[in-house]
């Protein structure tokens, strides 16, 4: 049986959301995308997205943002993802979490990255950190072109994904900032919640077996 350490990626391994960081990087000169970025900063739009996420478990802004990938070539996205991870994301690594990753790797744990971010990004992130495997949201591709839609979105299904792929394990460590990963954290022998703001501490203090890693 394996000793497994699961690491979330966005706002856990990195200081940023990798989905929108990549979109901002890739479409930095795209007029319509820049307009979209301004619109989603408006409070009414944020409120609608929050309610949609709360009731339906879907990030509407994220879904709409993904439409911008439509008709972009798979190989171009792959090349840009590699550059993005090496040159941009490398400056956003959370040192405290990177130390945890190196520790569990040294202890012989099987390192798994689980993220709702795009698969083409997390593939490069897994290579960068030398992770053993990764799970991410799959983007749909037809004839080597992105359709702007998700083939499989794992944003809210990490717990079920883990149970499906790892039926037996000796020890489990989970490191994430996501409150939606609570069930996965409760399953872990070693559970760490990354607290990026003080309000996160208030949430996690109710769970005595979950250790908070302050990063604010």
Label each PLM-derived region with a short phrase:
Residues 60-96:
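Metal-dependent phosphoesterase signature
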Residues 15-19, 57-58, 155:
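Generic structural signal for well-ordered secondary structure
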Residues 23, 48-53, 59-69:
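Helix-loop "lid/cap" segments that line or gate small-molecule binding pockets
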Residues 1-52:
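Active-site neighborhood of HAD-like aspartate-dependent phosphohydrolases
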């Amino acid at each position: 049986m394996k000793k497994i350490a699961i690491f979330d990626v966005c706002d856990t391994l990195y200081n940023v959301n990798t989905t929108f960081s990549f979109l901002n990087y890739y479409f930095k000169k795209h007029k319509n995308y820049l307009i979209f970025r301004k619109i989603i900063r408006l409070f009414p739009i944020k409120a609608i997205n929050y309610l949609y996420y709360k009731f339906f478990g879907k990030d509407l802004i994220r879904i709409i943002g993904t439409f911008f990938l439509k008709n972009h070539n798979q190989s171009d996205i792959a090349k840009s993802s590699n550059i993005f991870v090496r040159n941009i994301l490398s400056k956003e690594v959370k040192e405290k979490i990177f130390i945890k990753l190196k520790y569990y790797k040294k202890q012989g744990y099987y390192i798994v990255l689980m993220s709702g971010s795009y698969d083409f990004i997390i593939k490069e992130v897994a290579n960068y950190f030398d992770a053993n495997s990764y799970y991410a949201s799959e983007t749909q591709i037809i004839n080597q072109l992105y359709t702007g839609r998700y083939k499989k979105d794992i944003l809210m299904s990490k717990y079920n994904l883990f149970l499906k792929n790892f039926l037996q394990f000796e020890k489990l460590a989970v490191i994430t900032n996501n409150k939606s990963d609570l069930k996965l954290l409760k399953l872990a022998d070693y559970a760490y919640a990354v607290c990026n703001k003080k309000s996160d501490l208030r949430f996690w203090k109710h769970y005595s077996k979950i250790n908070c890693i302050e990063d604010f």
